Protein backbone atom coordinates (compact mmCIF):
# COMPACT_ATOMS: atom_id res chain seq x y z
CA UNK A 1 0.00 0.00 0.00
CA UNK A 2 1.30 3.47 -0.90
CA UNK A 3 0.06 6.19 1.44
CA UNK A 4 0.21 9.89 0.56
CA UNK A 5 0.90 11.76 3.79
CA UNK A 6 0.00 15.42 4.20
CA UNK A 7 3.08 17.68 4.10
CA UNK A 8 4.47 18.34 7.57
CA UNK A 9 2.71 15.30 9.06
CA UNK A 10 5.18 12.57 8.06
CA UNK A 11 6.93 11.97 11.39
CA UNK A 12 3.71 12.06 13.42
CA UNK A 13 2.05 9.73 10.93
CA UNK A 14 4.88 7.19 11.03
CA UNK A 15 4.80 7.25 14.84
CA UNK A 16 1.05 6.58 14.89
CA UNK A 17 1.30 3.98 12.13
CA UNK A 18 4.06 2.12 13.99
CA UNK A 19 1.75 1.70 16.99
CA UNK A 20 -1.04 0.48 14.73
CA UNK A 21 1.26 -2.02 13.01
CA UNK A 22 2.34 -3.46 16.36
CA UNK A 23 -1.31 -4.41 16.89
CA UNK A 24 -1.73 -5.77 13.37
CA UNK A 25 1.23 -8.11 13.90
CA UNK A 26 -0.82 -9.90 16.57
CA UNK A 27 -3.80 -10.49 14.28
CA UNK A 28 -4.59 -13.97 13.07
CA UNK A 29 -3.21 -14.52 9.59
CA UNK A 30 -0.69 -11.67 9.58
CA UNK A 31 2.60 -13.20 8.50
CA UNK A 32 4.50 -9.95 7.83
CA UNK A 33 3.94 -6.20 7.89
CA UNK A 34 6.45 -3.36 7.78
CA UNK A 35 6.76 0.32 6.84
CA UNK A 36 9.04 1.70 4.14
CA UNK A 37 9.99 5.25 3.20
CA UNK A 38 9.56 6.04 -0.48
CA UNK A 39 12.95 7.07 -1.91
CA UNK A 40 11.42 9.31 -4.58
CA UNK A 41 8.70 11.12 -2.63
CA UNK A 42 9.31 12.19 0.96
CA UNK A 43 5.58 12.30 1.70
CA UNK A 44 4.84 8.72 0.68
CA UNK A 45 4.92 5.76 3.06
CA UNK A 46 4.68 2.20 1.76
CA UNK A 47 3.30 -0.62 3.87
CA UNK A 48 4.13 -4.18 2.82
CA UNK A 49 1.84 -6.86 4.21
CA UNK A 50 1.72 -10.63 3.81
CA UNK A 51 -1.37 -12.50 4.99
CA UNK A 52 -1.82 -16.26 5.20
CA UNK A 53 -4.98 -16.08 3.10
CA UNK A 54 -7.50 -13.65 1.66
CA UNK A 55 -10.16 -14.26 4.36
CA UNK A 56 -7.63 -13.19 7.05
CA UNK A 57 -6.88 -9.97 5.17
CA UNK A 58 -10.58 -9.32 4.57
CA UNK A 59 -11.28 -9.77 8.29
CA UNK A 60 -8.41 -7.42 9.15
CA UNK A 61 -9.79 -4.72 6.86
CA UNK A 62 -13.12 -4.55 8.74
CA UNK A 63 -12.11 -5.30 12.34
CA UNK A 64 -12.42 -2.75 15.15
CA UNK A 65 -8.70 -1.96 15.13
CA UNK A 66 -8.82 -1.06 11.43
CA UNK A 67 -11.94 1.04 11.91
CA UNK A 68 -10.25 2.95 14.75
CA UNK A 69 -7.15 3.45 12.62
CA UNK A 70 -9.19 4.99 9.81
CA UNK A 71 -10.40 7.73 12.15
CA UNK A 72 -6.78 8.48 13.16
CA UNK A 73 -5.34 8.25 9.65
CA UNK A 74 -7.74 10.80 8.16
CA UNK A 75 -5.81 13.57 9.95
CA UNK A 76 -2.58 12.55 8.20
CA UNK A 77 -3.50 10.98 4.87
CA UNK A 78 -4.90 12.50 1.71
CA UNK A 79 -4.71 9.42 -0.49
CA UNK A 80 -3.68 5.79 -0.69
CA UNK A 81 -3.31 3.07 -3.26
CA UNK A 82 -3.84 -0.55 -2.25
CA UNK A 83 -2.48 -3.24 -4.54
CA UNK A 84 -3.50 -6.82 -3.80
CA UNK A 85 -1.21 -9.50 -5.20
CA UNK A 86 -1.08 -13.29 -5.24
CA UNK A 87 2.21 -15.13 -4.80
CA UNK A 88 3.45 -17.02 -7.83
CA UNK A 89 5.94 -19.16 -5.96
Each model region followed by its residue ranges:
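Short, well-ordered beta-strand segments in beta-rich or mixed alpha/beta enzyme
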Residues: 1-4, 34-61
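Short, surface-exposed ligand-recognition loops at beta-strand->loop->(often short) alpha-helix junctions
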Residues: 4-13
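Short hydrophobic/aromatic patches at helix-to-coil boundaries
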Residues: 85-89
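Short alpha-helix boundary/capping motifs
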Residues: 14-15, 63
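An amphipathic, aromatic/His-enriched active-site/gating alpha helix that lines ligand/cofactor pockets
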Residues: 23-31, 50-84
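Short amphipathic alpha-helical/adjacent loop interface patches that line ligand
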Residues: 17, 21
Amino acid sequence: MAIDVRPGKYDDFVSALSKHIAIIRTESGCEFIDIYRDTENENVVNVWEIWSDRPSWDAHMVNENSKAWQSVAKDFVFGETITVMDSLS
